[in-house]
Amino acid sequence: MTLIVDLGQSGSRARIDGQQIDSDRGKLNGESVVDSLRAIFQKLPESQVDIAALACTGFNGVVSDPQPFLALCSEFFGAKKVAVIDDGLAGFVGALGGSNGVVLSIGGGVVSVSGNNSHFAHRDGLGSTFGDEGGGFWLGKLGLTRALGIRQGRGDDQVLLSAFEDQVSAFDALKVKNAAEASTLAITSAKNLLAAADAGSPTAIAIRNEGAALLAQTVIATWLGAGGSLDDAPEIAIQGGPSKNPNYVSAIQANISRSLPYAKFVAARGDNLDGAFWIANNMHKDAEPLLRWATKAAQTH
């Protein structure tokens, strides 16, 4: 039996023996990936598995030593093998099923992975402080920042302020304004920013357009990084929470098409859980830096 986990910034999902368990417990700001998984595993039903496939945010494109992950999965589930996977690779495999192209995953953060005849490239995934441009944290932080400023009389965009009414109240309720709860508030505010843009807020539209342009740059850099050219026709899938907003996706696609005119935009065939499951069953060797395996040594008597 195989345990499949998809750990993101805004939540996590696990699949054991066909049963899926969704949680709003994700990787907290400043928390190690192993500590995040331990907190999630404590809430999962007791099970025995042979293999664990862990698709995780927080690696920034370089998967760390898999041995602590093997020890953790062995402790909770008796796992003998573990595949530790950058969430971008899991998203790529799940969405395109091996086709040449780029998968842009937008959650609280941003990760873009391309595959071009077995050459892989990874872009962004740099974390919310210095990267993840155009992602949920980025959108929500900018939107809530401007809403708070407008409330103080620094600007006048009542459409934005109205769209962020609940988020402003949530900010006021924060005991610490720059801790993990504040980061989570920024991520959950992304949908308010996009809704405000849809409602005609000039401030929100400007933020949305900038985010779309930055994400297009990320996609193009990812394709070129895998040895592609601007004359190619890669498949491009855009997935994740903010991608549920059609106007944001359209803006991203329009920006991509200006540089990659033959790009083919496709719907994702599957998600990170599907990708991690496929990797566990088909990619049995390391594909560093995005995939590393660890196997428990056989006991001798």
What residue spans do the PLM features occupy?
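ATP-binding/phosphotransfer module of carbohydrate and carboxylate kinases, centering on a glycine-rich
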Residues: M1-Q48, A95-N100, L144-H301
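Short beta-strand-loop/turn "lid" adjacent to the catalytic site in phosphate-handling enzymes
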Residues: R25-G26, Q42-V84, V93-L96
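Conserved strand-to-helix beginnings and helix N-cap segments that scaffold or border functional pockets
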Residues: V34, V63-Q67, G136, V249-S250
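Glycine-rich beta-strand-to-loop/alpha-helix junction loops that act as flexible
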Residues: A53-F59, I106-G109, P234-K244
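Glycine/charged-rich beta-loop-alpha catalytic/anionic-binding loops adjacent to active sites
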Residues: C73-K81, F120-G127, N255-K264
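Active-site nucleophile and cofactor-binding loops and adjacent substrate-binding regions
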Residues: V82-A90, S105-I106, E133, K264-D274
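Small-residue-enriched, tightly packed secondary-structure blocks
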Residues: G88-A95, G108-S112
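Glycine-rich phosphate-binding loop of actin/hexokinase-like ATP-binding domains
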Residues: S99-I150
